[in-house]
Amino acid sequence: LDPDEFNSEYIHVYPNENVGGAGGFTRGILESISAEDFKATHVLLMDDDVMVLPESFIRTYSLLALVKPQYSERYVSGAMLYFEQMNLQHEDVGYVHDDGSYGPNKRIMEMHRWDCVFENDEDVDFHEDSYAGWWYCCIPVKKIDRSHLPVPLFIRGDDVEFSVANHAEFLTLNGICIWHKGFANKFNANLELYMVHRNSLIIQAMSGICKDIDFIKRIQGFFETEIRRLAYNNCDLLLDAVEEFCAGPDFMKTPQGEQIMKSHAAKNEKMRPVAMVYSKPVNFDSVYKKEKKQLTPTQKWWYQVTDNGQKLPDWFLKKDYTAVIAYDWFDDPTKEYFAEQVLAVSPFDHTAYLRKRDKQRYQQLKQRYQRVMRYYKQNRKQIEQMYQQAAGTLQSESFWREYLHMPEAKK
């Protein structure tokens, strides 16, 4: 944005380096609570790649103007709807599930239906580890602690930590919402397998939140799934998450998030039009359907114990058989059982990546897995202490001002 084009009595553009969502949101928070020409009561945080209607701002202002004192310190959490299916609400308040995944407190709401509109505005009991996504989140200034600002994670997890660590409570209202692209049909292994898991471990260690959740167990489960689907790059990303967490918090002291993102994005499988990687016809409608005839208990045992035949001689495999599977979370071991190769398909844009068995890569990943997990278990307490000790610095106003090249706070 050109500041000269937008700066006015009511708008001020603050140029910022690419320091990710965490850096941008923290800059906005600090500028808002430090402004001398007006006294902000709330700070509204929003993603820059969403579609929003003026009605959301009108309703937010009206809600805050009418709110009773006992609710005045609650976050106003705007809902996220799918840009690709604009009637579907994904989430207004999310929470960290017991298995370490993240998702909505409510079911998916079809907001063109009257019953969903009514249900969506009913009182609900929020889970203990609930959070407001920063695609649209309005935070009371009195709930912002200058000594506990966001964790400098670049992207993913900063909003979760801020809500949970600050024991946030929430207000939601139909019509306070945005539409976001990409959530409905785009899987990014770099973000979902590396960034989310690395940051989950960091915010848990740094702030002591989500104590009962075993994120390592979740990572181990994904590693087993991905290596059996011949997704060697995905396994690399999972191990990168643990390895870089174990290296400690020093990487967060300087703005290098963009460089880290690019280096790990290079490990994403390069999806190409199906016809360029596979000559036979593909039934895209069946990609997200499980096979009617599932594996027998004996077949499941062989699948798991041999990591889908990777510990066996090649003559055990189904020769000339290419399994067509989903490229994302969806998993049906029956499809890829002892397949010679696997075609990971995105039916949304008809692209695919052909995975081929590589026993050398398989062995390297298994050895790395053992090494990384052993190091984590042996050093977990010391690693967590490093993050706890760094929290006071990394979340302080003085750190963030230096990080963002802002002037020192006026005393």
Residue ranges: model-predicted function:
Residues 16-35:
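Glycine-rich, basic loop-to-helix element that forms the pyrophosphate-binding segment
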Residues 37-51:
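Short beta-strand-to-loop acidic/aromatic patch adjacent to the donor-nucleotide binding site
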Residues 107-136:
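A recurrent flexible, glycine/aromatic-enriched loop bordering the glycosyltransferase active site
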Residues 132-136, 145-164, 169-178, 188-191:
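Donor nucleotide-sugar recognition loop
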Residues 55-104:
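Conserved donor NDP-sugar-binding/catalytic core segment of glycosyltransferases
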Residues 198-411:
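Terminal low-complexity segments of carbohydrate-biosynthetic enzymes
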Residues 1-14:
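Acidic donor-binding segment of Leloir-type glycosyltransferases
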Residues 180-198:
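Nucleotide-sugar-dependent glycosyltransferase catalytic core
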